[in-house]
Amino acid sequence: MGNSQGKEAQPASRGHTRRASAQGPASPSAAGASSASQERSASGVYSSRNNRGSTSFLGIGGSSEPRDPALEPRRETKAEREARKLEKERVIRAQEREKSLREEGVDGGYLVTLGVYTGPEDYSKPVVRQLQIERRLAPFWKGLNDHEDTWTEHQLVAVVNGRPLPAPDDIPPEEPQRPSNHLSPAWNPRGSESNLNNLTVPIGSRSMSQNSDRSNTLSPSHPAFSLPSPTSPIAANSSSSPFFRGRAKTLASLASGSRNTSQTDMAPQELNLPKDPYVNGQRIEAFLYKNAEECPICFMFYPPHLNKTRCCDQPICSECFVQIKRPDPHPPEHHGDAETPAPEPQEESQLVSEPAACPFCVQPEFGVTYEPPPFRRGLVYNQQGQPPLGSATSAMSSTSSLNSPAVTSPGRRRATSLAVNDKTVITTDMVRPDWAKKLSDARAHALRRAAAATALHNAAYMMGNISQHESRFALGRRRRTMFGSDSAGSSGQGTPRRDRDPSTGQAGEASNDLFPGRGSSRRGNRLDDLEDLMMMEAIRLSLAAEEERKRKDEKDAAKEAKKDGKKKAKELKKAAKAQSRIGSGFHPLDIDGLDESGVGSSSAAGKGKEVDRAVGNVGFNPMNEPTSTINTSSAKDDPQKHLETSRAQIQRDTSSSNLGPSDALEDQPSHRSALRNLSNASSSASSFAESYENSLRQPGQDSLAPGSIEPSPSGSGVNLSQTDTPPQGTPGTEPMFNFKSLADSITPEEQGEKDGGPQFIENVEGAHETSSKAPLASQSPKTEPTTQPHDSGLADSTMTLKPTLPSLSIDNQNGDEIKPAPRIEAVQNGHSDLDSKQLGDVSMIDGYHHHATQ
């Protein structure tokens, strides 16, 4: 690193040595001291410039200690700054008020307000002061709360000066000395000399070089040229006279201006007249307030010299007048008087400011006039000898003119109103000349706010549209929402993004810029776009809610399906366990039919003692069920279903009868109803006699039960394959009964009934042969059945029922309801009711009729 101080001190010493030698100090000691001080200052400058602290703004060096916020000076807010400024102005105004009340005045009045109104004084105080000194506006008179015409002079003086009202017969206090007795005739207001306006020379008639030469403009007969008396204020001290006190200031103001400078631009010179507390030999307070007049607005009593409205000639004091002003700038909603058109055409979006109206007659352009009292006291301008106050000079010349009503009466009451541009009219806009600036500021502020709001609205509008586009169209299709109209190339297919009304489309084509809606003509388009945006947002929220609902429904459905799958798996597992426990006495369960028939139905008939009340179960017990059954999983519209079911029940009934009377009797209740539904033409006894063991078997089948080496106990049943539902139309599913033999056996049955022996109505033989009638055996009740060979199939032992043949329609009296049938016994005679056959119960129709058994 090296010695930084040494390296920093070298250039400083060299530079300052050269400068010191060039200057050439007077003494070596002085030179040494100066060089040392310069080196120290230079080293300090360079050290502060090259120090590491100077790179702290780059984040390289410097102290890492944070600044304490308490040590830093707190920044003053705008509101605090305004409040501090107003407080300072209030203090200054209070001091000026006290000074003005003590030293200044105009004709017995004051140049500052006296507290009738406590609100902010936002009028132009210099303008009001100038108008009051010029006697164009009434001064701020002291107001009285009460006034009586019977008050004496000393009572009026006491009340005006703020003292308590004395008694009428009280001795008045000592009056001040009358200075008018010591004045020369020229200063005596009761004399016949000219008035005080001739004491000063008007500024407008003098040039800058003529200010010191008064003899050029004043006549020798002027009172200023006459020798004053020794008691005259001018003779006593002319240099200190108030008439010459502001001469240097006036010359300075004239030197900075031009000769053609207007009177309003140039600050006029104020002159303070001698203080005279008397007017016409009486106190000035008594002279002013002896004919007091009440202000109709503030209800205070003032001297009769009040302002008069230009329109209706009503009195109004100056404190009330300065409070009346224009209303604040506002939109031109309720503005539009046909009689008073706006001075300049206003745009729709700009603010307007209406002139103040008269509080009495509501005439616009409120203004007042003022006629001063017939004397002068206090401050005056040195150019008041000229108009507009020249007309009032005759009223202040002498006592006779003061007492003469002919001079002052013509202007007291007017029959017509004065024009607003009259030179004697003072309007509210003159009192507040900044109304135009306030209006322009308000308009500028409104325009700035409108521009900011428009920019914010456009930014939000464009950002919202862009975000919507990115969320909906992920393929890069951008909607040109920042322009007024849609282009065909923007969408890729020449299709607008949405239907818009014609007015919006036309306005969009007319305003094809980045910031629509800046002008007032495009406000409606912005509102339409906002409504469209709100509608699109509502639609988007609705679609999102619908998608959420669908997603929730799908989730719930998946949960339900999962639960159902678990439940089915548990049921299958239980069924498999139950099958493995029971053993080899059962056929394998049909797992596909668990939902239709149930698992427990196969094991419901335990040990061959349970009554089978179901027509088609999935599994069966070979001990009490036939070797074959028809499953109910076939189509319900199969016309052969009920026939196959009934046939299986009949075969089961006959096969169970071969086992023994106990099994047959137990199985009869479940098959009796099916037998009755099939045919009432034959009895169960005849069916038992005609049945042969192993008569209906397919080729290649044996009567062994699955898993057993013994023949099936019910070997004479219909043996189908393990599928339980063989295809329709196969020989194994054809009808097992010859209904033609049923018709042919009607005649032998009638003969059998006559003989009283058992009848044999069915004989199953070859498939293509007609069923033979059984011989009548009235003596022998039984006939040995002929055993068919095992290789004869179902097609050889049955006859097929063709679809073209009429089928048998059986009227079921009980409907499809299955009820337990009474016990059936085989009888030998024909007197049993069960063996009887009614011919009328059998009918033949042309067509198929399906009667459901379920």
Curated annotation (Swiss-Prot):
* Sequence ranges of Polar residues compositional bias: 44-57, 191-220, 228-242, 254-266, 624-634, 646-660, 777-815
Localization annotation: Cytoplasm
Sorted alphabetically, which keywords does the UniProt record give? Cytoplasm
CDD domains in the record, alphabetically? SIP5-like (cd24139)
Instruction: Give me the Gene Ontology terms describing cellular component.
Output: cytoplasm
Q: Which InterPro entries match?
A: Sip5/DA2 (IPR039301)
Cite the record's Basic and acidic residues compositional bias ranges: 65-103, 328-338, 546-563, 635-645
**Region feature Disordered, mapped onto this chain:** 1-103, 162-242, 254-274, 328-350, 381-415, 482-529, 546-839
Where composition is biased (Low complexity), the residues are 20-43, 391-401, 596-606, 675-695, 706-735
Please give the function described in this protein's UniProt entry.
May negatively regulate the SNF1 kinase.
Query: Hey, which family's this protein in?
Result: Belongs to the SIP5 family.
Please state what the protein is called.
Protein SIP5
From what organism does this protein derive? Phaeosphaeria nodorum (strain SN15 / ATCC MYA-4574 / FGSC 10173) (Glume blotch fungus)
Query: What is the phylogenetic placement of the source species in the record?
Result: Eukaryota, Fungi, Dikarya, Ascomycota, Pezizomycotina
